[in-house]
Amino acid sequence: KKDFPMKKSLFLLMLTASLSAYATNHEIKMLDNGKDGSMVFEPGYVNAKVGDTVTFKAANSGHWVQSKALPEGVADFLSEDGKDFTLKLDKEGVYVYTCPPHRMMNMSGVIQVGKPVNKAKAQAVVDEMENRAMQSKGRLKKYMAQVK
């Protein structure tokens, strides 16, 4: 019975590895031009699961990503100019983000993780961002409308 702790450790290691094998990394490109127009995140809406990650890919320079609305308990984030940035999605809810230098061009997006527990707060932020947008009005609302 001396090898029981070893078997238990091995079992827990295998269980952890199998659970992490189901996590997905979603890639979002920061682009000058994309399917939804100029200055855009592609895709602009991602539906993910708790435990997944999102990697914002700096396909063009001059872009970075900043959080605007997050589920309770998630720390604000701000990436560096022209650098890829990976975010672990640990909490259910709606994540709204933008590219600060192109916010007026409505370069923003939405990630839904599980249930949209903070949908009302996220919607209020989206409405405010849409009101301030000078270009591509309606694009962020279109992404938010996919949150179910």
Question: What do these predicted ranges mean?
Answer:
Residues L13-M14, M144:
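Short, low-complexity polar/charged micro-motifs in intrinsically disordered terminal tails
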Residues Y22-K148:
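Extracytoplasmic copper-binding redox domains, predominantly the cupredoxin/blue-copper superfamily
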Residues K1-P5:
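Short, Lys/Arg-enriched N-terminal segments with co-localized hydrophobic residues
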Residues K7-L13:
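Sec-dependent signal peptide recognition
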